[in-house]
Curated annotation (Swiss-Prot):
Keywords: Glycoprotein, Glycosidase, Hydrolase, Metal-binding, Zinc
Tissue/organ expression: Expressed in the skeletal muscle tissues surrounding the head, abdomen and thorax. Not expressed in flight muscles (at protein level).
Reactions the enzyme catalyzes: a thioglucoside + H2O = a sugar + a thiol
Protein name: Myrosinase 1
Protein family per UniProt: Belongs to the glycosyl hydrolase 1 family.
Cystine pairings recorded for this chain: none
Residues annotated as binding substrate: Q19, H122, N166
pH-activity profile: Optimum pH is 5.5 with sinigrin as substrate.
Keyword Glycoprotein: yes
Length: 464
């Protein structure tokens, strides 16, 4: 196989505001749900750390842009901190210094011929809005719409690529299994309500842009949908094949189906309705869209934005320790062949899973333009990060195979991440960066890893 990425293929890298910026209470920034969580419950973070300073990108953004420029990347995906723009999250009180920070970052990128790709929401809800109920409160979709309006107004003349939500399924986990902020345990219904509100919010932001801003700004909008890819444990078993399809619909059809087809996947509605009845509930745990909401949502992705890291095998059953959603009735496992002896890495590399996922998405949604908005490997932080290089090489080759052999319409690839950063409940114990950050140094010194050199070469040659 000697495939090569086309000349117009978009290579980029990705970060998120809470994970890299620091400056948690500087220049009028308000408190968000991660600030509140790490300050009141530091024990939930593996190493007891927080994102108060993180990579200090609030002060060192020019250094970050210089690194991106050196990599010759086409774009940089970063997220905006809602509470930096509007401290309470309500748009009647904006913070000019927060707006200035993002204007400076965007202008610095453009000055260096780097396209800004902006994520509006990467998990850091202003605490005041959480006090109102957060994403389980339907009113949040209107707050988000007004937040989006401000972003389009202030930045849309230069930003032409937007992501409304990063991995909405992860936000849902924060309401049901205490895996992310706000760290709530609203089992059975919390995650479905949070997902529903995010979808409506996405639809409202998309339609607002379409009607008010797209005619002059001419940008694109999507939503980054994540998840492992599920494959049948026994490829000969009809039960396992059916279970894998159901698991994939619960994992990513949950958000992809409404955005492309207007409603939740039929199999998801059927199973949640049935489980709700079995639990003696008077209605389904999965909210229903109105006809107007179906119309609002259908066709609200200008490209498919995919975050993907790993895959799992599934078989039918009730998992005694369900990772997240017991309503889907599947048990996950890994193929021993995926692992090295005596090793269970944080990310289990299954590159063929990405290829199969790209084919699945092509068949499911009519082969849309697809941008991989996150893919990467976390390790112990060594500079000679050859495991990360191996992971990237294999996943890039799987992407090429999907493009050339399966005719999947992949337009770009984003490596997670540019920098080591605050990896949520793992703190600083896992390192995804092409660039190492010394978190013990007040200067947060940046040092390029072997994977940096590797990825720079891929970008320049088009070959993994």
């Amino acid at each position: 196989m000697d495939y090569k990425f086309p000349k117009d293929f978009m290579f980029g890298t990705s970060t998120a505001s809470y994970q890299i910026e620091g400056g948690w209470n500087e220049d009028g920034k308000g408190e968000n749900i991660w600030d509140r969580l790490v300050h009141t419950s530091p024990e939930v973070i593996k190493d007891g750390t927080n994102g108060d300073i993180a990579c200090d990108s609030y002060h060192k953004y020019k250094e970050d842009v210089a690194i991106i420029k050196d990599l010759n990347l086409k774009f940089y995906r970063f997220s905006i901190s809602w509470a930096r723009i509007a401290p309470s999250g309500v748009m009647n009180s904006l913070e000019p210094k927060g707006i200035a920070y993002y204007n400076n970052l965007i202008n610095e990128l453009i000055k260096n011929d780097i396209i800004p790709l902006v994520t509006m929401y990467h998990w850091d809800l202003p605490q005041y809005l959480q006090d109102l109920g957060g994403w389980v409160n339907p009113i949040m979709s209107d707050y988000f719409k007004e937040y989006a309006r401000v972003l389009f107004t202030y930045f849309g003349d230069r930003v032409k690529w937007w992501i409304t939500f990063n991995e909405p399924i992860a936000v849902c986990k924060g309401y049901s299994i205490k895996a992310y902020a706000p760290n709530l345990n609203l089992k059975t219904t919390g995650h479905y309500l949070a997902g529903h509100t995010q979808l409506i919010a996405h639809g409202k932001a998309y339609r607002l842009y379409e009607e008010m801003f797209k005619p002059t700004q001419n940008g694109k909008i999507s939503i980054s949908i994540s998840g492992v890819f599920f494959m049948p444990k026994n490829a000969e078993s009809d039960d396992d094949i059916e279970t894998a399809e159901r698991a994939n619909q619960f994992e990513r059809g949950w958000f992809g189906h409404p955005v492309y087809k207007g409603d939740y996947p039929p199999i998801m509605k059927k199973w949640v309705d049935q489980k709700s009845k079995e639990e003696g509930l008077p209605w389904s745990k999965l909210p229903k869209f109105t006809k107007d909401e179906i119309k609002l949502l259908k066709g609200t992705a200008d490209f498919y934005a995919l975050n993907h890291y790993s895959s799992r095998l599934v078989t039918f059953g009730s998992d005694p320790n369900p990772n997240f959603n017991p309503d889907a009735s599947y048990v996950t496992s890994v193929d021993e062949a995926w692992l090295k002896p005596n090793e269970t890495p944080y990310i289990i590399p299954v590159p063929e899973g990405l290829r199969k996922l790209l084919i699945w998405l092509k068949n499911e949604y009519g082969n849309p333009q697809l941008l991989i908005t996150e893919n990467g490997y976390g390790d112990d932080g060594q500079l000679d990060d050859f495991e990360k290089i191996s992971y990237l090489k294999n996943y890039l080759n799987a992407t090429l195979q999907a493009m050339y052999e399966d005719k999947c319409n992949v337009i770009g690839y984003t490596v997670w991440s540019l920098l080591d950063n605050f990896e949520w409940f793992y703190g600083y114990s896992i390192h995804f960066g092409l660039v190492k950050i010394d978190f013990n140094d007040p200067q947060r010194t940046r040092t390029k890893r072997e994977s940096y050199t590797y990825f720079k070469n891929v970008v320049s040659t088009g070959k993994p």
